[in-house]
Amino acid sequence: MTADNTEAPPGPRRSDRTRTAILDAARQRFAAQGFERTTIRAVAADAGIDPSMVMRYYGSKAQLFDAALDIDLCLPDLSATPAEERAEALVRHFLHRWEHEGADDALLLLLRSAVTNDQAARRMREIFAAQVSPALGSAAKDNVGLVSAQLLGLALTRYLLRIPAVVRMTPEEIVAAYTPAVRSILEPQASAPGA
């Protein structure tokens, strides 16, 4: 009879768990209170650690805020998607993230903060320029700003301002309403009169 020496794979290191706990607490705090009213002490209390640990991992409140704003939109590469399907795929992707993934608390934090905080506004521009443009391919790169305006407008009205008419819409109704608008930006020649 042999002893079974298989062990479960190790979990995340304690330092990784601490860093994650701090970042999660910071995102929730910044989302609820904004940059100015959020304190390192409050973030530390929410994370269940000493405030000095927050400073050890992130250095300052501004650096913690910047880390909280580090977002991967997880966009699929749409450059190989047929042109007539890109708009719908993009709308569905963003809608799915906002509807189903807690990670988009960070995206909503960024959107909320970008209105009043220069650092957040800069970060929002960087994220959308660096991630949306490559996902759409070179043909659409000049229109990334307008596509972003459509998608961020949806997030603003549905998830931050919670405008009743937009909140009541089902995801399929939103896809049906937004896809033609995004398509008209991505493929202006296809939506032109007489095209």
Task: Describe the predicted segments one by one.
Residues 69, 98-129:
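Amphipathic alpha-helical segments used for helix-helix packing
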Residues 1-52, 62-63:
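Basic, helix-initiating cap at the start of DNA-binding domains
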Residues 19, 23-24, 36, 57-80:
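An amphipathic alpha-helix adjacent to DNA-recognition modules
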Residues 121-125, 136-195:
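Hydrophobic/aromatic-rich alpha-helical bundle segments in the mid-to-C-terminal region
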Residues 75-108:
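Hydrophobic alpha-helical connector segments
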Residues 94, 107-114, 147-151, 155:
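Short alpha-helical scaffolding segments that buttress acidic/His motifs in well-ordered protein cores
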